Amino acid sequence: MNHTSQAFVNAATGGQPPNYERIKEEYEVSELGAPHGSASVRTTVINMPREVSVPDHVVWSLFNTLFMNFCCLGFIAYAYSVKSRDRKMVGDMTGAQAYASTAKCLNISSLVLSILMVIITIVTVVIIALNAPRLQT
């Protein structure tokens, strides 16, 4: 409030503070105050587990299964990813993390070996194509 409105309120009430009616619940709370007697105060502590996100790598495993399934590593990674997702749904975060770690390693292995096989195949085809005219003569 600014200064002029305070003067108006004080003049309207005759200089006395306004008389507020006390709410019943407010009155009862102030009357009760602190607990009386020898009853001990009990506190309850609730431990809320923090939200832990365990990646299950299902999409990556599915991609490797469909497109880069070198020696069935993508399929095995997909199986471990599904196991990881199942463990996460049950609430076993340690088990889910272990399965997810295995799925991640298998996915990396499948990806690297498949890319190496593609590169080796391309290099082999190029070398054969470049040497083909020499072989015909």
Swiss-Prot record:
Transmembrane domains' residue ranges: 110-130
Modified residues (Phosphotyrosine): Y20, Y27
Keyword Zinc among UniProt keywords: no
Chain positions of cross-link Glycyl lysine isopeptide (Lys-Gly) (interchain with G-Cter in ubiquitin): K24, K83, K88, K104
Lipid-attached positions, S-palmitoyl cysteine: C71, C72, C105
Induction comment from the UniProt entry of this chain: By interferon beta.
Region (Interaction with SPP1): 60-93
Biological function: IFN-induced antiviral protein which disrupts intracellular cholesterol homeostasis. Inhibits the entry of viruses to the host cell cytoplasm by preventing viral fusion with cholesterol depleted endosomes. May inactivate new enveloped viruses which buds out of the infected cell, by letting them go out with a cholesterol depleted membrane. Active against multiple viruses. Plays a critical role in the structural stability and function of vacuolar ATPase (v-ATPase).
Protein's UniProt name: Interferon-induced transmembrane protein 3
Organism: Rattus norvegicus (Rat)
Originating gene: ifitm3
